[in-house]
């Protein structure tokens, strides 16, 4: 294992800021008058953070992704809507079905958002104009992991219920079995993270098998054993050079797989609670530390941690936009952004 050099960035303790919002005609509107939004941005600008409060106390943002046009999409737990943030304004787009564990979220080339909904047993698409289309799964029960969209428009997602990594294209599902069919539990390999590289090869983490799976465009499958036993594999992402980054949540590590070998980097904060991973255009790998109230970055073998402004923060999802701004969801009811200028430093 390659130990990581460590850097820490702390922003101290802050009071809980407020972004005042109201609902008009079903659309959430931010009050920009006075010191509302301006005060929030100004107060944290020196540390590079901006955060947006959810309109309702019951709103729990989960997964997050950024479209090419800069729209920030995010899923909401136990809600009949998906959220989006544009020009500093949060909107909730109704879906007609309540979400349960909407962990998978991605956007396609046309700007439509795709997400998983275990309760509805479906994969759902929301177009930029708000049109909703759902594709029901055939199983009576669904347990779903992450989701990714390939360059050809195919939607790939983890389906532990059927021990499969599944493709949805042109309304048709095709399952690629990655382990023996058995009850979802310790005997199930538990596919969870999914990502597609530019060549169309699909990568997935098999949580209980402690392996990284590869599915090539011709259907050939292979698996690679992770060096640390019982590492608790989670999210994964592909960088611009084709290297695979993955979280070892149980081992408190971030790993990189390239050229047939793994490198592992230990997170300096013990038991940090690693939940999500994203790779920036500049090549840095970013991850969330739910229990530590931090974001983490791996760059050139160095881990840098960024403490979030609020001491009660619970960062869960993460994404990086085309300008290298880092976006994250906070289960306590916030969407946050770490500015690219600050994200590059630390």
PLM ranges: what are they?
Residues 53-57, 94-98, 136-140, 177-186, ...:
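Surface loop/turn motifs at the tips and blade-to-blade linkers of beta-strand repeat domains
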Residues 85-89, 126-131, 168-172, 215-220, ...:
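Short loop/turn segments that connect beta-strands within beta-propeller blades
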Residues 314-346:
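Blade-level signature of beta-propeller repeat domains, shared across WD40, Kelch, NHL, RCC1
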Residues 72-78, 113-119, 155-161, 202-208, ...:
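Conserved beta-strand positions in repeat-built beta-propeller and related beta-rich domains
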Residues 66-69, 107-110, 149-152, 196-199, ...:
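Residue-level detector of Asp-centered blade-edge/turn motifs that repeat once per structural unit
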Residues 60, 78, 101, 119, ...:
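Beta-rich catalytic cores
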């Amino acid at each position: 294992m390659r130990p990581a050099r460590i850097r820490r960035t702390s922003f101290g303790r802050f009071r809980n800021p407020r972004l005042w919002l109201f609902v008009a005609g079903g659309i959430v509107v931010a009050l920009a008058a006075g010191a509302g939004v301006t005060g929030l941005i100004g107060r944290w600008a020196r540390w590079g953070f901006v955060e947006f409060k959810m309109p309702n106390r019951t709103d729990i943002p989960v997964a997050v992704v950024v479209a090419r046009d800069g729209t920030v999409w995010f899923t909401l737990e136990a809600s009949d809507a998906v959220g989006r943030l544009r020009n500093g304004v949060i909107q909730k787009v109704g879906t007609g079905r309540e979400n349960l564990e909407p962990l998978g979220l991605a956007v396609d080339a046309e700007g439509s958002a795709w997400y998983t909904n275990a309760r509805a047993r479906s994969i759902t698409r929301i177009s930029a104009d708000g049109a909703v289309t759902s594709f029901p799964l055939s199983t009576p029960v669904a347990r779903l992991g992450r989701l990714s969209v390939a360059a050809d428009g195919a939607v790939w997602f983890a389906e532990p219920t059927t021990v499969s990594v599944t493709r949805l294209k042109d309304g048709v599902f095709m399952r690629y079995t990655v382990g023996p069919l058995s009850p979802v539990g310790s005997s199930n390999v538990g596919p969870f993270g999914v990502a597609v590289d530019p060549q169309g090869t699909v990568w997935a983490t098999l949580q209980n098998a402690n392996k990284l799976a590869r599915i090539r465009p011709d259907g050939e499958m292979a698996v690679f054993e992770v060096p640390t036993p019982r590492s608790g594999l989670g999210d994964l992402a592909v960088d611009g050079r084709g290297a695979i980054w993955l979280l070892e949540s149980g081992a408190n590590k971030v790993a990189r797989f390239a050229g047939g070998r793994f490198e592992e980097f230990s997170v300096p904060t013990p038991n940090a609670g690693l939940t999500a991973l994203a790779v920036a255009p500049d090549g840095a790998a970013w991850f969330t530390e739910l229990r530590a109230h931090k974001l983490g970055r791996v760059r050139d073998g160095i881990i840098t941690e960024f403490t979030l402004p609020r001491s009660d923060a619970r960062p869960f999802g993460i994404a990086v936009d085309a300008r290298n701004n880092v976006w994250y969801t906070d289960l306590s009811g916030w969407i946050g952004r770490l500015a690219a200028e600050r994200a590059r430093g630390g």
